[in-house]
């Protein structure tokens, strides 16, 4: 059975980069009729917070990305300890005591000599007495996994054939000096024991994948199918990492972005398929193909979410927005007419309030100097309210006959005088809802 996972750290809220990983893994599992696991990577007790765990769940539920089961790494520490013991017994796990300063000096020396900055395995040469002395002086050391100096190869679902020389990679630290289990080990143990068959994550994990493949093999596990998607950049190709804090899903939600818009964009962004609004999750699942994604950095522009949101809202029936209309103050007996008139002119649900305020209270007129005399003459011909569906046509016909204006020169100044805007709903539909004309004052 196909099994995928999304493994966020509860050290913050889900941002757009996290979503891309979560969505790809979700769609793969659902398309194959498999299992999607939400795995909370909470092995760092100082940074992990329960409020972020709750936030992760809320964001995924808002998007409709429902998991089949949830796991927490903090409840599996004994499993990681057992794996570490196994690696020690195999001679593949060793303690190292260098300080960050010492490691930095080693790296600089290697670079100056034209060599790759790879850990020199000096700790393997320490005697038991030397280790005891270092522990007494510095405390417990870190634990490194001893890589086999060979090429590590796999067929990547996005990047194609990958080959990495392990001799160019430092033996990874799997356990910190304070005993904290790091992601590299915990992830391997979990993926193996949970039967994860497919792992999709960012291309910044490629080297990490190489080391994890060796750890999986050492522990007797089955290597899953890996795929590494490109990293997101800003619309001009700039690094997105510094902006991710402003691209949290809950912030986009607060700004009015709809789940369908977010999912439609992120399911296709970076692939050879065009971005199309999909309102049915089943269609997203059926149309997803990991092989259609490319390796080039993918430009993300949050502004692209709003046209999709607008198209989604325009297609909603009254029943789906009745609560939002009521909250904005639209009377129930006017809701159907209001929604029919405004639905094509709303980008987010936040636009409902301003449109209703305009219709209820009127708008400050926008009148160009060259149109003042014309507008005054036209307003003198505007009948008293209440208006109906024929008012606009009858009024503009009378104004045309009186002034000789026609086309845009006739309609635009009148629209701006009544609504304060140069664009908006069809005026024939809007007039019956317009209760105040401030331009008359």
UniProtKB/Swiss-Prot annotation:
<dbReference type="InterPro" id="IPR000924">
    <property type="entry name" value="Glu/Gln-tRNA-synth"/>
</dbReference>
<keyword id="KW-0067">ATP-binding</keyword>
<comment type="similarity">
    <text>Belongs to the class-I aminoacyl-tRNA synthetase family. Glutamate--tRNA ligase type 1 subfamily.</text>
</comment>
<keyword id="KW-0547">Nucleotide-binding</keyword>
<dbReference type="InterPro" id="IPR049940">
    <property type="entry name" value="GluQ/Sye"/>
</dbReference>
<dbReference type="InterPro" id="IPR020058">
    <property type="entry name" value="Glu/Gln-tRNA-synth_Ib_cat-dom"/>
</dbReference>
<feature type="short sequence motif" description="'KMSKS' region">
    <location>
        <begin position="239"/>
        <end position="243"/>
    </location>
</feature>
<keyword id="KW-0648">Protein biosynthesis</keyword>
<dbReference type="InterPro" id="IPR020751">
    <property type="entry name" value="aa-tRNA-synth_I_codon-bd_sub2"/>
</dbReference>
<dbReference type="InterPro" id="IPR014729">
    <property type="entry name" value="Rossmann-like_a/b/a_fold"/>
</dbReference>
<dbReference type="InterPro" id="IPR001412">
    <property type="entry name" value="aa-tRNA-synth_I_CS"/>
</dbReference>
<comment type="subunit">
    <text>Monomer.</text>
</comment>
<dbReference type="GO" id="GO:0004818">
    <property type="term" value="F:glutamate-tRNA ligase activity"/>
</dbReference>
<dbReference type="GO" id="GO:0006424">
    <property type="term" value="P:glutamyl-tRNA aminoacylation"/>
</dbReference>
<feature type="binding site">
    <location>
        <position position="242"/>
    </location>
    <ligand>
        <name>ATP</name>
    </ligand>
</feature>
<feature type="short sequence motif" description="'HIGH' region">
    <location>
        <begin position="8"/>
        <end position="18"/>
    </location>
</feature>
<keyword id="KW-0436">Ligase</keyword>
<keyword id="KW-0030">Aminoacyl-tRNA synthetase</keyword>
<dbReference type="Pfam" id="PF00749">
    <property type="entry name" value="tRNA-synt_1c"/>
</dbReference>
<dbReference type="GO" id="GO:0005524">
    <property type="term" value="F:ATP binding"/>
</dbReference>
<dbReference type="InterPro" id="IPR004527">
    <property type="entry name" value="Glu-tRNA-ligase_bac/mito"/>
</dbReference>
<comment type="function">
    <text>Catalyzes the attachment of glutamate to tRNA(Glu) in a two-step reaction: glutamate is first activated by ATP to form Glu-AMP and then transferred to the acceptor end of tRNA(Glu).</text>
</comment>
<protein>
    <recommendedName>
        <fullName>Glutamate--tRNA ligase 1</fullName>
        <ecNumber>6.1.1.17</ecNumber>
    </recommendedName>
</protein>
<dbReference type="GO" id="GO:0005829">
    <property type="term" value="C:cytosol"/>
</dbReference>
<keyword id="KW-0963">Cytoplasm</keyword>
<dbReference type="InterPro" id="IPR045462">
    <property type="entry name" value="aa-tRNA-synth_I_cd-bd"/>
</dbReference>
<dbReference type="Pfam" id="PF19269">
    <property type="entry name" value="Anticodon_2"/>
</dbReference>
<dbReference type="GO" id="GO:0000049">
    <property type="term" value="F:tRNA binding"/>
</dbReference>
<dbReference type="InterPro" id="IPR008925">
    <property type="entry name" value="aa_tRNA-synth_I_cd-bd_sf"/>
</dbReference>
């Amino acid at each position: 059975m196909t099994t995928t996972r999304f493994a966020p750290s509860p050290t913050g809220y889900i941002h757009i980069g996290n979503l891309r990983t979560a969505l790809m893994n979700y769609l793969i599992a659902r398309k194959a009729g498999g299992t999607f696991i939400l795995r909370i990577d909470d092995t760092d007790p100082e940074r992990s917070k329960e409020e972020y765990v709750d936030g992760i769940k809320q964001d995924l539920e808002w998007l409709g990305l429902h998991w089949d089961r949830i796991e927490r790494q903090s409840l599996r520490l004994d499993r990681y300890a057992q794996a570490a013991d196994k690696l020690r017994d195999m001679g593949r796990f060793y303690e190292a005591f260098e300080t960050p300063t010492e490691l930095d000096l080693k790296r600089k020396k290697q670079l100056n000599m034209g060599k790759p900055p790879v850990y020199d395995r000096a700790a393997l040469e320490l005697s038991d007495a030397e280790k005891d002395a270092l522990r007494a002086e510095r405390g417990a050391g870190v634990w490194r996994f001893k890589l086999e100096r060979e090429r590590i190869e796999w067929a990547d679902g996005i990047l194609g054939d990958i080959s990495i020389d392990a001799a160019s990679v430092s033996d990874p630290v799997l356990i910190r000096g304070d005993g904290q289990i790091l992601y590299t080990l915990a992830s391997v143990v979990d993926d193996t024991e949970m039967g994860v068959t497919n792992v999709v994550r960012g291309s910044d994990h490629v080297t990490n994948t190489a080391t994890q493949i060796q750890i999986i093999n050492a522990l007797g596990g089955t290597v899953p199918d890996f795929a590494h998607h490109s990293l997101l950049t800003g619309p001009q190709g700039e690094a997105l990492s510094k902006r991710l804090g402003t691209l949290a899903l809950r912030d986009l939600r607060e700004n009015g972005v709809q789940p369908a818009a977010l999912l439609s964009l992120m399911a296709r962004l970076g692939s050879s398929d065009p971005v199309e609004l999909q309102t049915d999750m089943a269609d997203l699942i059926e149309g997803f193909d990991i092989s259609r994604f490319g390796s080039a950095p993918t430009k993300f522009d949050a502004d692209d979410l709003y046209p999709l949101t607008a198209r989604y809202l325009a297609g909603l029936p009254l029943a789906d927005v009745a609560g939002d209309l009521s909250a904005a103050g639209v009377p129930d007996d006017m809701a159907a007419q209001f929604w029919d008139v405004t639905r094509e002119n709303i980008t987010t649900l936040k636009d409902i309030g301003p449109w209703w305020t305009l219709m209820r209270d009127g708008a400050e007129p926008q009148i160009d100097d060259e149109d003042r005399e014309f507008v005054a003459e036209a307003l003198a011909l505007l009948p008293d309210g209440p208006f109906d569906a024929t008012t606009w046509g009858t009024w503009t016909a009378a104004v045309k006959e009186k002034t000789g204006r026609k086309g845009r020169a006739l309609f635009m100044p009148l629209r701006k005088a009544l609504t304060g805007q140069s664009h908006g709903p069809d005026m024939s539909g809007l007039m019956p809802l317009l209760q105040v004309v401030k331009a008359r004052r």
